[in-house]
């Protein structure tokens, strides 16, 4: 039976980044149930780096991740991980209260977010329906993220530090014996004193195999469409446009347009597929807000974003099951928080001191703990 210091379950951004960090401290094996890494949520993300997204914990983790994503270590990637892409939040006349709430949270998170006039927003976007925008604010330093580069960079770190990856390795049993977890995949069994549960939408199911209590993790489906703009309409310089109540967003994507109804439909863990109702909803909302007419879709897909009750990620040792570390509930924020989250997970798994830069953003181990009162 092959032995390791750490076994990480799940090959999305959470598992790969945590495994790369853990490989600084010991021998790491990453297990992925699918044929390739990042098949589910990570590989379907419309990732964007913004300080105006998520609750206070998410915003702190995002801020702590910014320096890494802006200037990664030498050799991490062959190109920049992010590129400038401003974001404009818009509101109709009947959304004034929601806009005020959004603006207050936004300006508390970033001093660079400012309110702009409807005319300025319309000029920046270029395709808003006349009279639609009553208020707007601008995040000038938001960024587009290259998900593939970020994920492959962590994978490269993992293997360079001696870590190994095994795909088509769905965990079927977890048994602790003589201080070691025996992790059986059906064809092989591996052992390690510490297991990190980064199984995404399946994290509660993996926990059940270990005898741990579930977190009450709820996967939620998010739908995305791609469509071509009308002939003669150039949206390459268009910002990310998002409704102040997250009823829709759209942005340019490699010469076409990516849009979403920002849906959060409860789902079991699965290979998520888009529903026609959600596709119709995003088409209707974007057409109502803009001069765009969506005649044909270039592509459509869906992914799962998994949350616990307080919508804050869960990182740390299970309070009852020795050697079982949670790394789950990232919601839709896993990529932009991955540098900070991976260091938090590795710190807690190894018992090292909490990172000072993460603490400086108001995030402490107890805030992410699976034993925190808000999960009771």
Descriptions of predicted regions:
Residues 1-14, 29:
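Beta1/beta-strand and adjacent pyrophosphate-binding region of the FAD-binding site
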Residues 2, 320-376:
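C-terminal lid/capping helical subdomain adjacent to the catalytic/cofactor pocket in oxidative enzymes
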Residues 7-9, 190-202, 342:
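Short hydrophobic core segments
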Residues 17-22, 49, 71, 77-86, ...:
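Active-site substrate-recognition segment that forms the wall
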Residues 23-42:
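Glycine-rich FAD pyrophosphate-binding loop
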Residues 46-124, 247-249, 285:
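Dinucleotide-binding Rossmann-like beta1-alpha1 core, especially the glycine-rich loop
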Residues 78-89, 103, 109, 114-161, ...:
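Helix-loop-beta segment of a Rossmann-like dinucleotide-binding subdomain
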Residues 137-193:
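Helical element adjacent to the flavin cofactor pocket in flavoenzyme catalytic cores
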């Amino acid at each position: 039976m092959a032995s390791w210091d750490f076994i990480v379950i799940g090959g999305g951004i959470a598992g790969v980044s945590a495994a790369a960090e853990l490989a600084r401290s010991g021998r790491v094996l990453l297990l992925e149930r699918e044929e390739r890494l990042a098949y589910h949520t990570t590989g379907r993300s419309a990732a964007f780096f913004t300080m105006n997204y998520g609750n206070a914990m998410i915003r702190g983790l995002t801020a702590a991740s910014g320096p890494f994503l802006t200037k990664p270590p030498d050799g991490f990637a062959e190109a920049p991980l992010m590129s400038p892409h401003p974001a404009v939040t818009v509101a109709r006349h009947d959304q004034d209260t929601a806009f005020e709430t959004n603006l207050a949270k936004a300006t508390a998170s970033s001093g660079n977010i400012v309110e702009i006039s409807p005319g300025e927003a319309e000029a920046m976007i270029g395709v808003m329906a006349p009279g639609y925008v009553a208020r707007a604010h601008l995040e000038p330093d938001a960024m587009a993220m290259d998900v593939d580069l970020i994920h492959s960079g962590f994978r490269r770190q993992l293997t360079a530090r001696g870590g190994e990856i095994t795909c088509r390795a769905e965990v079927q049993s977890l048994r602790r014996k003589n201080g070691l977890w025996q992790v059986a995949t059906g064809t092989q069994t591996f052992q390690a004193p510490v297991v990190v549960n980064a199984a995404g939408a399946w994290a509660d199911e993996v926990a059940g195999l270990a005898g741990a209590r579930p977190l009450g993790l709820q996967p939620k489906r998010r739908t995305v469409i791609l469509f071509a703009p009308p002939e003669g309409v150039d949206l390459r310089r268009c910002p990310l446009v998002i409704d102040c109540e997250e009823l829709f967003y759209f942005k340019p994507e490699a010469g076409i347009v990516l849009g979403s109804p920002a849906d959060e439909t409860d789902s079991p863990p699965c290979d998520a597929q888009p529903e026609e109702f959600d596709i119709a909803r995003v088409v209707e909302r974007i057409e109502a807000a803009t001069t765009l007419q969506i005649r044909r879709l270039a592509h459509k897909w869906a992914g799962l974003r998994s949350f616990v009750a307080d919508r804050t990620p869960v990182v740390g040792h299970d309070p009852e099951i020795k050697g079982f570390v949670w790394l789950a509930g990232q919601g839709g924020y896993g990529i932009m928080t991955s540098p900070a989250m991976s260091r938090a997970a590795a710190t807690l798994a190894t018992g090292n001191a909490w990172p000072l830069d993460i603490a400086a953003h108001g995030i402490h181990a107890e805030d992410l703990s699976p034993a925190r009162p808000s999960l009771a």
